[in-house]
């Protein structure tokens, strides 16, 4: 633990090798700060800023996954009103699931902006370019092991099982 104002459930590392439940192993880019913009909730709510944005808070909650990246265009899932795309990112309602997420679009041992939260389900999100017309929150990492690669175009998340 360093003095970088991080949550007590988090370890600041450059390389993330998280294998425990409920205790995400995080690197030096995502720290807790109550006066910043974004939130990282280590159960079911994960809010990711882009690679160079360090505005993240840590809370325990079971709500949504919120991905923010300036490269995302305004999009919206057709069949799930809880999944809203906007210019800065998209909100993905993902209950009862804890995922491995590498926001820097690489494997979790190499880059400095990886958020790892292994708990119950093992889903790897490598990249943030998602294109889907049918994806729903219940289809993401719900009792299945799924991997999303960078620039992967997804037409049906159920096929990634």
UniProtKB/Swiss-Prot annotation:
Highest taxon, organism lineage: Eukaryota
Start and end residues of each stretch annotated as Disordered: 1-67, 80-147
Residue ranges, compositional bias (Polar residues): 135-147
Extent of Low complexity compositional bias: 84-126
Protein name in the entry: Putative uncharacterized protein DDB_G0282281
